[in-house]
């Protein structure tokens, strides 16, 4: 199993934007999403922990948001994060960054996902913890 930690505030995958230049439509990823994906991709590339995966994959994503002041410092990690970013959009950003880092050939290889959102405990940094495992042939 491979494991990575992307520190910093998690950014969910934003909706693609469209602009018209010279009568032609151009689609692009929002700047905040692009910046986070680029940072995550760099972390994945610097520590690939093996070759590109070709078969079916299991991905585990744990998203940790900074603890709000209203929650107690002790035990904040036991609270699930239920506001702001949708978990599915956080997963999309992570998997896109993994594919861009050439950890997998295509995101369709991901056949099993386990994900959760939490608040960080005490003064821990906001982060995304990602692990990926090849699960062998599905035949």
Predicted regions and their residues:
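Acidic, proline/glycine-enriched N-terminal capping motif
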Residues: 1-139
């Amino acid at each position: 199993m491979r494991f990575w930690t992307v520190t910093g505030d998690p950014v969910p995958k934003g909706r693609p934007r469209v602009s018209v230049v010279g009568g032609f439509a151009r689609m692009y990823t929002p700047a905040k999403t692009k910046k986070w994906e680029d940072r995550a991709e760099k972390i994945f590339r610097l520590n690939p922990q093996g070759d590109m995966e070709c078969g079916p994959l299991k991905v585990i994503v744990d998203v940790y948001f900074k603890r709000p002041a209203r929650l107690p410092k002790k035990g904040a990690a036991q609270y699930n994060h239920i506001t702001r970013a949708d978990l599915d959009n956080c997963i999309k950003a992570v998997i896109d960054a993994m594919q861009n880092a050439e950890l997998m050939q295509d995101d369709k290889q991901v056949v099993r996902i386990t994900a959760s959102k939490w608040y960080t405990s005490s003064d821990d940094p906001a982060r995304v913890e990602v692990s990926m495992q090849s699960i062998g042939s599905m035949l």
